[in-house]
């Protein structure tokens, strides 16, 4: 089957069409702006899969309707998913703009004095606003000389932020969310909302009963040679933690081996269901070999599967990580308990950064006073105002141990194309696999256990659906915190010492939901959240505005908030603007 091509960025150089001197004097400068923009984006960006980003430049500068139509025909044939219009001069506003209603679009008007690029920018944005097709404005802070071909830092920041978010929008469109199972333990996020996926993300939902996973395992609809490779890899790399179950619930070596085998099979089969596997066609399973074109998935597990079969912890942890028995590779997005809304936050984070995502329960707020009472330890540094215990039953990406290193030697989680095999091995070495707690998981399984290194910048996110309003996004930038080992042990054992932990300290602003750490916990909209490496809340805000998802909670500096220019016409408070604009324009794909 033909591989689906990746979305490209379209660059639209627009120009003053008056001949006999005006257009001729601007052709080279205008096209050079387009080429410089394309060079920047191809150098600085990659798709989440690691592939290079491609830009498509209009064959000619665009002065009016005819050239705009020719450009659109070219873009339509080359899978252009977002566009950037560039110009150093006056052009004819509504005659030259990109009119595709669902394609993210930005306009860079050169800040120069010789020709009025800013005037075109304002005129074109006015046309976008009047026609109900929002666009992003890019205008440099400082005047440049006409022959200055450099891209100022503030312009570069906006170009890259727009492009990252726009590529995420284009990459999600037309894909599916694989809902493997149904509602897990009444968790609202696993009540999968087809309208949300279709109208806001341009995605479909593929609903598959968990018996399909059972069928694939029982009928050997998988690559048996790969299973042996996976088992050998686990034998080499897995360190096992203590079994905290009562004696009558502990498994012998043969039973434990069977649980491990099925856990690895679950990972293989869920992966094959998401993306397909040509090797299944070789064994006569052509239909199954195609997969479901899923860019994200969720596995219900509890309780209809886990009361009888091994839980999804091992499968989900491996799939969400940037490596497995095949080496370093792009992480998958698989949501625990089929929490599709947390899955969407994971998907957004992965598309924006190319990194693995850490799925976690937002479990406990620990005040400084409570920690001192329980452990005798006084919190300081990043943790001085209290911390949130992010912990779940073992499905977090193993990258979350932060045993990878940035260029300065600091702990981090890298895009998968930058991860060495040694770093992958270090993450595995930092992880223990603990037998699942029988009270929770009667069918057994293994939960990964690691502790995230401290001092690492993270962004925690979550999508929620509010009746009468629609989807909203929550964002909390902060840092992981490292506690003294004895303090961690005391706190961790009060919850579950067989699961992975991140101690998280959000950055406080002193007002609203970020008045203090307690307020962050109190305002979090659900029981789950996602950690994405870095302080990337601004990218999430831009992406959300493209999809028309308002942000109900964030601690991003106001100067970094970047939304379409029309948002400014929806009031003077930027967060109120966001709600009114999203309501006014409605979901991007308006179903």
From Swiss-Prot:
- Functional pathway: Carbohydrate degradation; L-fucose degradation; L-lactaldehyde and glycerone phosphate from L-fucose: step 1/3
Q: Which cofactor does it need?
A: Mn(2+)
Q: Where in the cell is it found?
A: Cytoplasm
- Please tell me where this protein is predominantly located: cytoplasm
Q: How is the cofactor bound?
A: Can also use Co(2+).
Q: What induces it?
A: By L-fucose.
Q: State the active site.
A: 337, 361
What is the activity-regulation note? Inhibited by ribitol, L-arabitol and dulcitol. Isomerization of L-xylulose to L-xylose is inhibited by xylitol.
- Span-the-membrane segments of this chain are none
Biological role: Converts the aldose L-fucose into the corresponding ketose L-fuculose. Also converts D-arabinose into D-ribulose. In addition, catalyzes the isomerization of L-xylulose to L-xylose.
The record's note on quaternary structure and interaction partners says:
Homohexamer.
Q: What is this protein called?
A: L-fucose isomerase
Q: Please tell me the species this chain comes from.
A: Escherichia coli (strain K12)
Q: Which gene encodes it?
A: fucI
